[in-house]
Amino acid sequence: MTPTTELTRKVLTDRGFSGWVPFAGLGDSDIPKAAGVYVVLRPDTSAPVFRPSSPAGQFKGRDPSVAADVLAAAWVDTATVLYVGKASAGKEGRRGLRKRLDEYRRHGSGQAVGHWGGRYIWQLEDSASLLVAWCPTQPDQNPGQAEFELIAEFVAAYGVRPFANRNRGTATAGPVP
């Protein structure tokens, strides 16, 4: 991935990201079963409105809701990318983007599914209009490294992680500039 000053839909599309569908449309999308990275984008750059509680599922009894002041502190003005995630193939090669994005969608719809990362997005009033895009990684490329590099690029542009990323990803190679 070539660094840029801003991660936009156009930049990401030029890099091979596709989809750009709301979570509700993921089931009808041709999402690859391969490993890769994905992003959640908010096309609207107006100030966010946060729900008082999250509609997401309570996996292992944990409430995914976050206080509004915590959400506001994590918000990145002018950024459209809200979350960067990864999907590994898994030990048996049965995971990948399709399965991981389905878990994320189901978690947001209230099911008790294990997708704790990125949970902040579900407290946005306009979460139904967020767009999801994905990009398979090459067979010799670790999706955790690709995720780490995208997050590092975002940090270089904005000084902080994307809104819903609470960690910097999983690097498997050397440091990212």
Describe every region a protein language model picked out.
Residues 1-82, 86-177:
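Boundary/linker segments flanking structured domains
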